[in-house]
Design a protein with these regions (language model features):
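Active-site loops and adjacent core secondary-structure elements that bind or stabilize anionic groups
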Residues: 1
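N-terminal secretory/targeting leader peptides
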Residues: 4-195
Length: 195
């Protein structure tokens, strides 16, 4: 484990991820047996299995073709990516389940920050302030882009299903075993839940 080699500056929003499919999905039961493309991640694959579907790790640039050729039944991503990659053309059903939100961390090397401080003691504070300011701007712009993409997709004719509170609770209960499978990260998971 490397300690104190990176300094956190801020986090950018990479959007909330939801499922989109070739056929309409409205409930957890509807996911049973479907093949869904997920990011290359053991945790994401475990989540898909716990939801009753089959995970498929398809290279992102091939997702459109895989959907078009019925190699997969669906995928998951955020609104802007769904729109930009044209996945709505071959998977026009969007299940707004919001199962993941992935932050993009802005980091700096501790050694670089120390070298900057040697040049001018104000530089590390300036870098941190810029990180914070850029994150606030990025998150505002991302929210606008996300809303714009969702609006455009709805206008295009994508059928959106938003989970009820009860159905969302069923999704949460189904993936509870994922937390146990990644117990070594349990303290971090607990801190995120409490935030």
């Amino acid at each position: 484990v490397y300690k104190r080699q990176l300094v956190g500056l801020s986090w950018f929003d990479a959007g909330v991820r939801s499922f989109y499919t070739r056929e309409k999905v409205e409930t957890l039961a509807d996911l049973a047996g479907l093949t869904l493309r997920v990011q290359e991640s053991d945790m994401m694959s475990e989540m898909i299995l716990d939801l009753g579907a089959k995970p498929a790790q398809v290279v992102y640039s091939r997702v459109y073709a895989a959907l078009h050729n019925a190699e997969i039944d669906g995928a998951e991503n955020n609104w802007p990516s769904y729109e930009a990659m044209g996945h709505y053309e071959v998977a026009p059903y969007f299940l707004k389940d919001e199962h993941a939100r992935v932050p993009e961390l802005q980091l700096a090397s501790e050694a670089a920050m120390e070298k900057l401080a040697e040049l001018d003691e104000r530089f590390p504070d300036i870098i941190r302030a810029c990180g914070k300011e850029s994150a606030l701007a990025e998150r505002r712009l991302w929210a606008e882009r996300e809303a714009s993409a969702e609006k455009h997709m709805r206008e295009w004719g994508v059928e959106v299903t938003t989970l009820s509170a009860a159905e969302k609770a069923r999704f949460r209960a189904a993936v509870e075993p994922v937390y146990a499978a990644f117990e070594e990260q349990s303290r971090l998971i607990q801190r995120i839940r409490e935030a």
